[in-house]
């Protein structure tokens, strides 16, 4: 399931987000994208509230990065030939005429331009983006613990003991349709059966029909606690 945009095609949106307005869709995409992007390629969240579509947001970010404000005459900034060639070609509308670069550009705007051009847009696997997002949030909240991925499950460990497991599930879950996560539920109970920890959370994107957790009980009544949890895609740590 892809999420992003491709030049000449337009935006590609997972069905779970298809009913959102432009601002909320952009806000969610930027939050997910920033978890997968390097520091210089991240997009400030303020761009989501501009009312622009995803492609326009990235082009606006490039234009803003290309502006040189209040240059200091007392400092000599490093000059990157590759970056200059890319930015000049972009500004003149002749990017296709730029020959292959022997070195990678250093300027953030040039890096974004090259990324957009090489991929004909920005489009990621939504499952991977969501998993990385959940991992980053858990690691930030539990900074004093060892947080790691193992077999598709995020574990938090302290003192050599697993405390809980979190399984990202990029599906449109509701109280009436939580069977869509049957595969993840089975894997969760299987992991709990090992006895190394007693709490498992299967997290899926929050939606209008999935705003409270769902407790899932095993038929035999044993095997630890397992919950389906609505996960908010936000820059906040909670």
Which role does the model predict for each range below?
Residues 118-238:
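Catalytic core segments in nucleotide and nucleic-acid processing enzymes
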């Amino acid at each position: 399931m892809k999420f992003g945009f491709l030049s000449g095609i337009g935006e590609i949106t997972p069905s779970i987000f298809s009913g959102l307005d432009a601002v909320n869709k952009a806000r969610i995409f930027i939050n997910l994208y920033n978890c997968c992007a390097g520091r210089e390629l991240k997009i400030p969240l303020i761009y989501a509230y501009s009312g622009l579509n995803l492609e326009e947001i990235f082009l606006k970010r490039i234009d803003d990065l290309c502006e040189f404000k209040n240059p200091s005459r007392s400092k000599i900034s490093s000059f990157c030939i590759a970056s200059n060639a890319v930015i000049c070609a972009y500004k003149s509308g002749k990017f296709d005429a730029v020959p292959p670069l022997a070195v990678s550009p250093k300027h953030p705007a040039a890096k974004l331009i090259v990324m957009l051009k090489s991929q004909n847009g920005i489009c990621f696997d939504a499952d991977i983006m969501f998993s990385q997002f959940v991992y980053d949030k858990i690691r930030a909240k539990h900074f004093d613990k060892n947080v790691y991925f193992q077999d598709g499950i995020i574990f938090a460990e302290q003192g050599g003991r697993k405390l809980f497991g979190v399984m990202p599930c990029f599906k449109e879950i509701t109280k009436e349709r939580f069977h869509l996560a049957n595969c993840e539920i089975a894997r969760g109970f299987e992991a709990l059966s090992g006895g190394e920890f007693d709490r498992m959370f299967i997290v899926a994107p929050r939606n209008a029909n999935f705003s409270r957790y769902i407790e899932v009980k095993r038929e035999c009544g044993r095997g630890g606690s397992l919950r389906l949890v609505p996960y908010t895609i936000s820059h906040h740590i909670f």
